[in-house]
Amino acid sequence: MFPRLSQLETRTIAEILRTETAGGAVLIVAAVLAMVWANSPWAQSYGTVTGFVPWPGGEPVGLDLNIRHWASDGLLAVFFFVVGLELKREFVAGDLRNPQRAAVPIVAAVSGMAVPAVVYTAINLHAGADALRGWAIPVATDIAFALAVLAVIGSHLPSALRAFLLTLAVVDDLLAIAVIAVFYTESVNVVALLSALLPIAAFALLVQLRKTWWWALLPLALATWGLVHASGVHATIAGVLLAFTVPVLQRRGRPGLAERLEHVWRPVSAGVAVPLFALFVAGVSLRGGAVAAALADPVAIGVVAGLVLGKLVGVFGATFAMAKFTRATLDEDLSWLDVAGLALLTGIGFTVALLVGDLAFGSGSERGEHVTFAVLAASFLAACLASVVLCARNAAHKRVRGPH
């Protein structure tokens, strides 16, 4: 029924998955499947599968995790490894190494994280300390999801818009990683954390020597992940730490190792890790008054307002202020309506938002379910609003430039 793919077919699928657009499309499909499954006659099986513990004997080493936790702690480590490679490449050899070019997207990213956090906090100020733990949920943008929407509606939009979104998202990812590491680590096992430096150092030595021995690198990566997990720091940070050791610059005319590893692992991240995370985390029941309960929760209201309103005000406001009060100028191909559409697009928060929701309120909790619903609703609303603005701008650019 499912014949084995040829080498050419395998390569073709991998190339497709290397594009953010395809990754976003697969992510959307996985999220929809999760929602359908969680609200189908087989909804009970969804809870059974996500709550299943594959290795009950792993309790002594803290690895008696259920499927949902393996998805958020394990699979997302691959996603953060790819993000880390991209971050280092951008800072060493990309746009972010030029302070003048990087200034506007960096300020826009910082403001686009700060304003949603303020909006969320203002709404939940009197909802109790527990509610305030979710302040970081609306701060991050899901770049794969956002680029998938942009690709569908923006065939004639200037390339500068996509480049700005990509650069902003890189900074956004870096700050989101810092937020998770600093604010969502409750206690640290110093011995385990220091022990993680040993496999990291060995991994760094091999990659600096350009030795891509998978039989050595993979066990070192797994050891790093296990020790970081045991330390109390979220295990996905292990992926970032390992990525930062990989050299970026070329040698003897060959692409840098960071680029080559990103080329290998991006399809795994986009086609397997992130979609499975979405499948096992995004399923939330909409039956029996669940929607009404979520809409009455200030946490859910704060998440929606932060993503949709906070991102728009933060990104657009910072970009406008930079153009108004500094020497920075808007690209000649762009208008402020283009920037407004892009700012709305950054309100699509998914992967990191769901992860932070789990860290803040616990996976499977009632409030955690409200957060999942809010993230999905806000992302859908932001995508719709951005589509309205950018479709109009796409038509305008098409008239100016012609159909080609």
UniProtKB/Swiss-Prot annotation:
Any Pfam family the entry gives: Na_H_antiport_1
Protein topology in the membrane: Multi-pass membrane protein
Protein's cellular compartments: Cell membrane
Keyword line: Antiport, Cell membrane, Ion transport, Membrane, Sodium, Sodium transport, Transmembrane, Transmembrane helix, Transport
Presence of the UniProt keyword Ribosomal protein in the record: no
TM helices/strands, residue ranges: 22-42, 67-87, 103-123, 134-154, 163-183, 187-207, 213-233, 276-296, 298-318, 336-356, 371-391
Cellular component GO terms, alphabetical: plasma membrane
Top-level taxon in the UniProt lineage: Bacteria
Catalytically driven reaction(s): Na(+)(in) + 2 H(+)(out) = Na(+)(out) + 2 H(+)(in)
Biological processes per GO annotation: regulation of pH
GO molecular function, one term: sodium:proton antiporter activity
Keyword Ion transport: yes
Role according to the record: Na(+)/H(+) antiporter that extrudes sodium in exchange for external protons.
Similarity comment: family membership: Belongs to the NhaA Na(+)/H(+) (TC 2.A.33) antiporter family.
Name of the protein in its database record: Na(+)/H(+) antiporter NhaA 2
Organism: Saccharopolyspora erythraea (strain ATCC 11635 / DSM 40517 / JCM 4748 / NBRC 13426 / NCIMB 8594 / NRRL 2338)
Gene that encodes it: nhaA2
